[in-house]
Amino acid sequence: MKIMFLGNDTVEIKDGRFFIDGYDAIELAEKFGTPLYVMSEEQIKINYNRYIEAFKRWEEETGKEFIVAYAYKANANLAITRLLAKLGCGADVVSGGELYIAKLSNVPSKKIVFNGNCKTKEEIIMGIEANIRAFNVDSISELILINETAKELGETANVAFRINPNVNPKTHPKISTGLKKNKFGLDVESGIAMKAIKMALEMEYVNVVGVHCHIGSQLTDISPFIEETRKVMDFVVELKEEGIEIEDVNLGGGLGIPYYKDKQIPTQKDLADAIINTMLKYKDKVEMPNLILEPGRSLVATAGYLLGKVHHIKETPVTKWVMIDAGMNDMMRPAMYEAYHHIINCKVKNEKEVVSIAGGLCESSDVFGRDRELDKVEVGDVLAIFDVGAYGISMANNYNARGRPRMVLTSKKGVFLIRERETYADLIAKDIVPPHLL
């Protein structure tokens, strides 16, 4: 199959129509209704295997373990998480709910890491009882709570420490996490991170296993990863000088994807070369650790498409508006981050036109793209919004009392419904009316 769209290996235009994994997108829209999320099983497999292939050198050259811990925040649909678990993928969870899904997905406990800057006691209990690989500790108060909770349970909790390296990830400020001004991590320069680890070593119910770092999301430049890796390994050397040995280095996630189809960005191989080459420079100073990464977007984003049907077209003095039945409640990224997503008409026409694509919500920010060149759009056409497999359905909501959409999985075994559309009854299922209003 010829790759027609950068980053999207399993789609093509055939006989004037858009196909995903060999399935006609227009027919999928007709069968399952719109708006509709379509996830490509084959693309997820391709993306995961690119990580494994790129980082196999780590295990070959160091004899240490390499773990991909999928960031469930990107898309925690149970079919997606089970697919990745079957491939051998671990889990990066940030809530009790995500841990619950990871266990339902049969992810081995020793491949689960628990992130987040405000873990509750209930979540810590869940993690300890699940015997997860590590809590990535974000504060001294959290460390104290983990130790106290483990004591109450009569167990020992494995902990790694999330450090803040003050690295500029060169990404959108709302998804930057590794600068001093960000809320995440323990500061290294001031000595807080070292203090926390030394405190942990004096505690009876925690076991220090590693160092963690995550500097941001949608990084399209390798240099911040190199700086992050260097600063983490410098800290590992400092720990060694204090007589502290660690088993795991977790460098988080963040590798970007090509939302713009005319812009090449770093690959998993580029990331692997940068990280491995940097870490190996320290092999004479410290024993090489197990290596953990937490990709989310780069595993599932390019596997997802949001199909929306055109219901109305409106000409204004400024633009030609195309109104589709998908909205910002279904996919928040353009409204929240002013994010770009490639959009096409699923039916190829002989004529092009410039249009703006919007949803039907009562918000001026409910716009998927402005002044885009598409094949001529008519009422009834189906548009495909690309690269929505991450932070699409996971950020969907019920604004304007709209139900979240269906999701299907395309695979070599067929097309499977993996999330049902919410009904009007679902919208009020958790509401309770007091007796005096009945």
UniProtKB/Swiss-Prot annotation:
Pathway: Amino-acid biosynthesis; L-lysine biosynthesis via DAP pathway; L-lysine from DL-2,6-diaminopimelate: step 1/1. Pyridoxal 5'-phosphate binds at S217, G254, E294, P295, G296, R297, Y391. It is an enzyme of class 4 (lyase). Its EC number is 4.1.1.20. The keyword Amino-acid biosynthesis applies. The active site is at C362 (proton donor). PROSITE patterns: ODR_DC_2_1, ODR_DC_2_2. Substrate binds at R297, R333, Y337, E363, Y391. One of its GO terms (molecular function) is pyridoxal phosphate binding. Keywords: Amino-acid biosynthesis, Decarboxylase, Lyase, Lysine biosynthesis, Pyridoxal phosphate. The keyword Secreted does not apply. It catalyses: meso-2,6-diaminopimelate + H(+) = L-lysine + CO2. It comes from the Archaea. Its cofactor is pyridoxal 5'-phosphate. Gene3D superfamilies: Alanine racemase, Lyase, Ornithine Decarboxylase, Chain A, domain 1. Competitively inhibited by the substrate analog azelaic acid in vitro but not in vivo. GO terms for biological process: lysine biosynthetic process via diaminopimelate. The modification N6-(pyridoxal phosphate)lysine is found at K73. Specifically catalyzes the decarboxylation of meso-diaminopimelate (meso-DAP) to L-lysine. NCBIfam families: lysA (TIGR01048). Homodimer. Belongs to the Orn/Lys/Arg decarboxylase class-II family. LysA subfamily. This is Diaminopimelate decarboxylase. It comes from Methanocaldococcus jannaschii (strain ATCC 43067 / DSM 2661 / JAL-1 / JCM 10045 / NBRC 100440) (Methanococcus jannaschii). The gene is lysA.
